[in-house]
């Protein structure tokens, strides 16, 4: 976390002893980073949000997507999940989103996306976000996104990953 106050709060709330840490995504040395199967990332939305100036990649915050792409290229996780504001879809007449999808596809990933609203998943607020999912194993196509409206009972089993084990709890999920 680049923001010193947010970093401090995170360390107060969570036990971070022994965690791998880098306070700025632009300075990550991927060879020092542990391997992983799933990369979950968000890049700053201000550059794409209708509430902001919508400067896109001309805004330094907008270029952080390319740092995420660098991590994906260097570490080659089986999956990635990215999140941002729906304004990303229409920014620069869709060219920005096309660049993002093309960049991820050129890295060898199958890429899907969908706009989801938190209110449809038991969260007491309406907050739309675009989710971008990528995976190396083509057998996952159509099994991650789109998915039906959440009912709080279970997740699908996906194939791939380094352990090849189930990635859902057999007893299902409870509503929040």
Predicted regions mapped to residue ranges:
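SAM cofactor-binding core of SAM-dependent methyltransferases
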Residues: 1-27
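Class I S-adenosyl-L-methionine
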Residues: 28-38, 46-176
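Glycine-rich, N-terminal phosphate-binding loop of Rossmann-like dinucleotide-binding domains
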Residues: 43
């Amino acid at each position: 976390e680049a923001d010193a106050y947010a970093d401090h709060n995170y360390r107060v709330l969570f036990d971070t002893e022994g965690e791998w840490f880098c306070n700025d995504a632009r300075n990550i040395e991927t060879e020092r980073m542990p391997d992983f199967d799933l990369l979950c990332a968000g890049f700053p939305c201000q550059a794409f949000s209708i509430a902001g100036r919508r400067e896109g990649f001309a805004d330094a915050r907008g270029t952080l997507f390319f740092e995420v792409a660098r991590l994906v290229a260097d570490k080659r996780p089986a999956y990635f999940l990215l999140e941002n504001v729906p304004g990303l879809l229409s920014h620069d007449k869709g060219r920005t989103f096309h660049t993002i999808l093309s960049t991820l596809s050129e890295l060898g990933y199958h890429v899907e996306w969908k706009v989801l609203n938190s209110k449809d998943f038991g969260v007491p607020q309406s907050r739309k976000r675009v989710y971008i999912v990528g995976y190396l194993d083509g057998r996952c196509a159509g099994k991650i996104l789109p998915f039906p409206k959440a009912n709080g009972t279970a997740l699908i089993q996906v194939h791939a990953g380094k352990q090849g084990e189930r990635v859902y709890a057999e007893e299902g999920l409870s509503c929040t």
